[in-house]
């Protein structure tokens, strides 16, 4: 039953993270190598921000209309994650229920919700995770990662 389902049952726990002092070329490389669009930014296990493909696209659009990988590499390697990450975070706890997660997604225009316990990042939920979970629940199946 959805009312009893906690966030911990469908959050992703194997996370790739970056540090605020990492450069945006590392972020670009991680996005290119993986099938995700959000990266939690962590300092000493504490979530300090999130960087997404949206921030990366804003930066690369500033370069110009003609793509030049060398210019792109030089430019992105000069920008720190901490300079462009989203610091205004909406988070959720692993013990919260699915309705709280839906409510938080409904609050704003974002597609990932960091799961934080005692100040530390323990998981991540994306809007895709939530839709997939609800679809499987409605089909009568349990969604497990």
Predicted features and spans:
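Short N-terminal signal/transit or membrane-insertion segments
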Residues: 12-20, 47
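A glycine-centered beta-loop-beta connector
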Residues: 31, 39-55, 105, 113-128
